C-alpha cells in the first residue's frame, strides 16, 4: 500500500490517473535536462522539493538563497544549460534579489522557483506574504504567479523560452506557485503534456545584404577590431577565429567571452587594449553591449571607429552606439557568413602585428611582476604574488588552461583580470560588480565539472559576504580552492577615500582568521604570511579540497582600476582617462 501511495505521489507508475502539480513541475525540469537544483528548503516549496528528490534530482542545499542563484548562474554560464534555483516565500525570495539582478545584468538564463502562500489565505495576512513578482519583475524576463493547475506546464514552457532568449533578451525568470496549487491533482486530459518537450532554440540567419555590407567595411578598413561578449558564446569560437583570420582584425575579449580565442592567436592583443580602442577605424562587436566597461562606445573612447554590431538580441545591438550595419542573427552564423564573403580578401595585418608585439611584451612583463613584486611597506604580501604562485604551479599540479578560475572583489578583481590569463573558463561578477560571488560560483562550477580544478581568488571583504557557503562545499564535496587576499580593508574604496577625500572611514576590516573559519566548517585551511609559502599552501589546498588559503596581503597595493579612478566614480565615464577624454570632447563641442 505504501509503495502504491509513493508511486501516486510521485506521478510515476501505471496506476496514475491524475498528477499533482508539483510532480508535473519536477517532470518538466527533468525533461529539460535539469539534474540538480540549488536552493534552501521551506514549507511553501516542499511539494516540489519532495518530488525532485523522489525522482533522483540532486538537491544542493545552501546557506543563503542568494548563493543558490549564484550557483545556478555559474552552472548556466559554464555548461550552457539553463539552471534552476528554488527558494521559499517571503525572505527566501527577497534574499535572492541581488543575485537575480546580477544574473539579469549578465544576461544569464536561469529559472528561479519561489514559494507562495495558499490562495485561500490571500489578503488575510498569511505567513511570509509579500508581492514577490512586483519586486522581481524589473530584473527578470518574466515574473509570474501560477494559479491555474492545468496551465502550469504551459507557463513553465513559456518561462523557459523567455529565459533562453527565444523571445528576446536572455536572463533570469521567476515563477511561483501557491502551495495549495502545488498539491492539486491535474487529470490526464488537462495536463497539456505537449509542453514537456524541450525545444531547440531558434537560430536566426543574417541577411545577405548585411553580410556583404560588413565585408565591404572590413575591406576598406586599415585597423579593424573585433570585441566579443557573452553573446559570442553561442559559438565554440571556430567561426570567430575564421573571421579574425579572414579580416586581419585585432581581437579583444571580455570576461564574458574569455577562452573563445586562444591567447596564442595572432589577433589576441588584450594587453594592448587601450591602443586598440583608441586607434581602430572599424569596431565590430559580437554579442557585447557597449557598457561602461567599453566606455559606452563613446567617440571619446573610440575616436576613429565606424561601428558594426552583431548579436542575437537587441540589448547587444542598439545600446549607446548604433552601427553602420546591425545584424540581428545567431552570431556564429553571421561570423561564418562574413568570413565566407571575405574568402578572396588578403588582409593587411601590419597594425595587428604591431599590437601583438606590444601585447607579448606587456604580458611577459606583467607575468614577471607576478613573481617578483615586493611586499608592501607594511611588510605584507602583494596580491600579484598569489597569481605568480598559481603561474608557477602551472604544468605541475595545475593545468591553468583547464582550471576554472574565478575572481571576486574590488581591487582583487582588477588584479585578477590581469593575473588570470591562461584559464579558458573564467568567471567574475561581470558588469553589475556584485561582490560575494567567488565561493558560490566555485561550488556551482565544481559540481558541474567535478574532474576539473576550480580556484577562486577573492578579496576578504567579498569573501565575507558568502563565507558560510564553505559549509555547503564541505557537505556537497565540492572540490574548490578559495584563496582570500586578506588586506583587512575594502581597499578600492579605501584608496579613493585617501586620495580624493583625505579621510579614511568605514573601509577598514578586522584581521580575521579566514583559514580558521574554513576549518570550523570542516574544510582544509591555511594562513600564509610569506610569499615563499604560497606555492606549498596552494599545492596542499588542491590536494585537500575543499580548502581555503588565507593570504595576508598589503593595503599598499593599488590596483590598476584604483589608479584609473574606478572607486571615485567620475561624472561621464567609469575610468578617469576616459572621463577626461569625454570632458574634452564635450568642451570641443561647446
Curated annotation (Swiss-Prot):
Signal peptide: none annotated. Pfam families: TPP_enzyme_C, TPP_enzyme_M, TPP_enzyme_N. Binds 1 thiamine diphosphate per dimer. Keywords: Lyase, Magnesium, Metal-binding, Thiamine pyrophosphate. The active site is at 493 (proton acceptor). Transmembrane segments: none annotated. This class of enzyme could be engineered to produce biotechnologically interesting condensations of formyl-CoA with aldehydes and ketones. GO terms for molecular function: acetolactate synthase activity; flavin adenine dinucleotide binding; lyase activity; magnesium ion binding; thiamine pyrophosphate binding. Its cofactor is Mg(2+); thiamine diphosphate. SUPFAM superfamilies: DHS-like NAD/FAD-binding domain, Thiamin diphosphate-binding fold (THDP-binding). Its EC number is 4.1.-.-. Activity is stimulated by thiamine diphosphate. It catalyses: 2-hydroxyisobutanoyl-CoA = formyl-CoA + acetone. A lyase that reversibly degrades 2-hydroxyisobutyryl-CoA (2-HIB-CoA) to acetone and formyl-CoA. Probably also cleaves 2-hydroxy-2-methylbutyryl-CoA to butanone and formyl-CoA. Does not act on 2-hydroxy-2-ethylbutyryl-CoA. A C-terminal lid closes the active site upon substrate binding, and with residues Leu-127 and Ile-492 restricts the size of the active site cavity so it can only use short-chain (C4 and C5) acyl substrates. Part of a pathway that allows cells to grow on 2-methylpropane-1,2-diol or 2-hydroxyisobutyric acid (2-HIBA) as a sole carbon source. This is 2-hydroxyacyl-CoA lyase.
Amino acid at each position: 500500500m505504501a509503495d502504491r501511495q509513493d508511486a501516486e505521489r510521485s506521478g510515476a507508475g501505471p496506476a496514475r490517473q491524475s498528477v499533482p502539480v508539483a510532480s508535473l513541475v519536477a517532470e518538466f525540469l527533468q525533461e529539460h535536462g535539469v539534474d540538480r537544483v540549488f536552493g534552501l528548503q521551506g514549507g511553501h516549496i516542499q511539494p516540489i522539493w519532495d518530488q525532485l528528490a523522489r525522482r533522483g534530482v540532486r538537491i544542493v542545499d545552501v546557506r543563503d538563497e542568494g548563493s543558490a542563484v549564484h550557483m545556478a548562474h555559474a552552472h548556466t554560464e559554464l555548461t550552457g544549460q539553463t539552471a534552476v534555483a528554488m527558494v521559499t516565500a517571503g525572505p527566501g525570495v527577497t534574499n535572492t534579489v541581488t543575485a537575480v539582478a546580477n544574473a539579469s545584468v549578465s544576461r544569464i538564463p536561469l529559472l528561479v522557483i519561489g514559494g507562495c502562500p495558499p490562495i485561500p489565505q490571500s489578503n488575510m495576512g498569511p505567513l511570509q506574504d509579500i508581492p514577490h513578482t512586483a519586486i522581481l519583475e524589473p530584473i527578470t524576463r518574466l515574473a509570474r504567479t501560477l494559479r491555474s493547475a492545468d496551465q502550469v506546464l504551459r507557463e513553465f514552457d513559456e518561462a523557459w523560452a523567455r529565459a533562453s532568449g527565444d523571445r528576446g533578451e536572455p536572463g533570469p525568470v521567476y515563477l511561483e506557485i501557491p502551495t495549495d496549487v502545488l498539491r492539486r491533482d491535474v487529470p490526464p486530459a488537462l495536463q497539456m503534456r505537449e509542453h514537456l518537450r524541450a525545444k531547440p532554440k531558434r537560430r536566426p540567419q543574417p541577411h545577405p545584404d548585411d553580410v556583404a555590407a560588413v565585408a565591404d567595411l572590413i575591406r576598406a578598413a586599415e585597423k579593424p577590431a573585433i570585441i566579443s561578449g557573452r553573446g559570442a558564446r553561442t559559438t565554440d569560437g571556430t567561426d570567430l577565429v575564421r573571421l579574425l583570420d579572414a579580416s586581419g582584425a585585432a581581437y579583444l575579449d571580455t570576461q564574458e567571452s574569455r577562452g573563445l580565442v586562444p591567447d596564442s592567436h595572432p589577433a589576441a592583443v588584450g594587453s594592448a587594449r587601450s591602443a586598440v580602442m583608441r586607434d581602430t577605424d572599424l569596431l565590430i562587436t559580437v554579442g557585447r553591449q557597449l557598457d561602461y566597461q567599453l566606455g559606452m562606445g563613446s567617440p571619446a573612447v573610440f575616436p576613429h571607429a565606424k561601428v558594426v554590431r552583431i548579436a542575437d538580441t537587441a540589448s547587444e545591438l542598439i545600446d549607446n552606439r548604433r552601427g553602420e550595419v546591425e545584424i540581428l542573427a545567431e552570431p556564429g552564423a553571421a561570423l561564418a557568413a562574413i568570413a565566407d564573403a571575405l574568402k578572396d580578401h588578403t588582409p593587411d595585418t601590419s597594425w595587428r602585428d604591431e599590437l601583438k608585439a606590444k601585447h607579448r611584451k606587456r604580458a611577459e612583463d606583467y607575468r614577471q611582476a607576478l613573481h617578483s613584486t615586493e611586499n608592501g611597506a607594511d611588510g605584507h604580501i602583494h596580491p600579484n604574488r598569489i597569481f605568480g604562485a598559481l603561474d608557477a604551479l602551472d604544468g605541475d599540479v595545475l593545468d591553468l588552461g583547464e582550471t576554472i578560475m574565478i575572481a571576486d572583489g574590488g581591487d582583487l578583481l582588477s588584479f585578477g583580470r590581469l593575473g588570470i590569463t591562461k584559464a579558458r573558463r573564467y568567471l567574475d561578477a561581470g558588469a553589475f560588480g556584485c561582490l560575494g560571488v567567488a565561493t558560490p560560483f566555485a561550488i556551482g562550477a565544481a559540481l558541474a565539472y567535478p574532474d576539473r580544478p576550480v580556484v577562486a581568488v577573492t578579496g576578504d571583504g567579498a569573501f565575507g559576504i558568502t563565507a558560510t557557503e564553505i559549509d555547503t562545499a564541505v557537505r556537497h564535496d565540492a572540490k574548490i580552492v578559495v584563496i582570500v587576499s586578506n588586506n583587512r580593508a575594502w581597499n578600492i574604496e579605501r584608496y579613493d577615500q585617501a586620495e580624493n577625500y583625505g579621510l579614511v572611514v568605514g573601509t577598514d576590516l578586522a584581521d580575521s582568521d579566514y583559514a580558521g573559519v574554513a576549518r570550523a566548517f570542516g574544510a582544509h585551511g591555511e594562513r600564509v604570511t610569506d610569499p615563499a609559502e604560497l606555492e606549498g599552501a596552494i599545492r596542499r589546498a588542491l590536494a585537500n579540497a575543499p580548502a581555503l588559503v588565507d593570504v595576508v596581503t598589503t593595503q599598499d597595493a593599488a590596483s590598476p582600476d584604483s589608479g584609473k579612478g574606478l572607486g571615485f566614480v567620475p561624472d561621464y565615464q567609469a575610468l578617469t582617462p576616459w572621463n577626461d577624454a569625454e570632458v574634452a570632447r564635450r568642451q570641443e563641442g561647446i
